[in-house]
Amino acid sequence: MLITVVGLNHRTAPLAVREKLSFPEHTLKEVLRGLSDREGVESCVVISTCNRTEVYAVLSEEDGLQNIWCFLAERCGSPVEAIKSHTYNYSFGESVRHLFRVSSGLDSMVLGETQILGQVKQAYQFAQQVGTVNWLLNCAFQQALAVGKRVRTETGIDKNPVSISYAAVELARQTLGSLEGREVLIVGAGKMSELTVKHLLSHGVAGVIVSNRSYPRAVELAAQFGGRAVRFDELYRWMGHADIVISCTAASHYVIRAEPMTSVLAERGGRAIFFIDIAVPRDVDPAVGHLPGVVLYDIDSLQSVVDANLAERRRAAVAAERIIDAEVREFLLALGSRFVIPTVVALKKRGEEIKRNELDRALNRLGGELSERELKVISSMANSIVSQLLHEPITRLKKLALTPEGHFYSDALQKLFNLEPENGGVPTLVGRTESCPVSCLKGKGC
């Protein structure tokens, strides 16, 4: 029994391939059941986002891995070898490490992003509802969620914005202080503007005004966020109401010029106005930045913020990798130990049965002529023989349990001695079956 992951992401597969193997939520139940019905696949969880599709599975037979690839190939109508060329596969400790890195945002396109942790949790909970999660995947995903939270808490890897839109809002917040109660004018209604509005609203701005050359598009974006749309030829009039102006159009010339801004600033009675120009080519004439009461940042200013923040995230990622190394090691040690316990108990029980049977047979053959002292000596000798015979294999098994392949040695011992551990050798977890962090594996309660 082992955990494996078969997946593809933005690094291994182009968008055309990722689209074919993207599983919308309404198909996930069918996908999970289809996978778990395949021979050798005991349980599974599927994570499907815009940048990755991953199947985490517990395999009871080696054929299970090939059957996962076959399933994916059938779903997208491609040959198995074509699918394999775009996927990666990790097993044993490396599959656990990969899951922990994914939940921590270290495997994401945007290093340290937070959305993936919620996506991992959602995928896990959905598979639980469908009934395709066994105790081993349960433990792995519970711990992955805990590790993802720990990494973010201890390293702050998600604290520094690395997108231009987020950096624009963060720069405004750092310069102006709280954004609550501020009026914002967005010039342009493209994707970047949409993302910027989302970030602004999360910081509690009072209102958003949207202006765009295509007025219907301005209306659409404003309606999406409960803002106000204004016509492009009224831009300067409405600029007088704004504390922050963020411009991102596709114009090939300056959209906001210095001369009209002089009148706008006069009407504002000395109130400062903060410009962020994230367009390329620039929307705001650099001369605007020299006007009294104006603070102007352009894309290069923002890029320096992004670069600095990305460097901070990379430094945090080094610390995150150390945390993950320790967490993987602890998880595998706890898991290996729990696998060994039923085998050790069964082996001792078998030794005790053999000792008792052979001792009874020997005493019957000797008759009732032995003194109490002689019986005690013979019984002690039998105990010592069994204890010494089992001591070395049990000691070595416990040490081997601390390796990623530990449970294989446990399986081998069960076969060699024809042992039948309780629950088939599957660890009995302490506490609630629906929750299984490492503390449960160690028998400390959940």
Curated annotation (Swiss-Prot):
Quaternary structure and partners: Homodimer.
Residues that, per the record, bind NADP(+): G188, A189, G190, K191, M192, S193
InterPro entries: 4pyrrol_synth_GluRdtase, 4pyrrol_synth_GluRdtase_dimer, 4pyrrol_synth_GluRdtase_N, GluRdtase_CS, GluRdtase_dimer_dom_sf, GluRdtase_N_sf, NAD(P)-bd_dom_sf, Shikm_DH/Glu-tRNA_Rdtase
Annotated Pfam families: GlutR_dimer, GlutR_N, Shikimate_DH
Main enzyme class: oxidoreductase
Organism: Desulforudis audaxviator (strain MP104C)
UniProt keyword annotation of Secreted present: no
This protein's name: Glutamyl-tRNA reductase
Family to which this protein belongs: Belongs to the glutamyl-tRNA reductase family.
Domain comment quoted from the record: Possesses an unusual extended V-shaped dimeric structure with each monomer consisting of three distinct domains arranged along a curved 'spinal' alpha-helix. The N-terminal catalytic domain specifically recognizes the glutamate moiety of the substrate. The second domain is the NADPH-binding domain, and the third C-terminal domain is responsible for dimerization.
Upper classification of the organism: Bacteria, Bacillati, Bacillota, Clostridia, Thermoanaerobacterales
EC number, UniProt record: 1.2.1.70
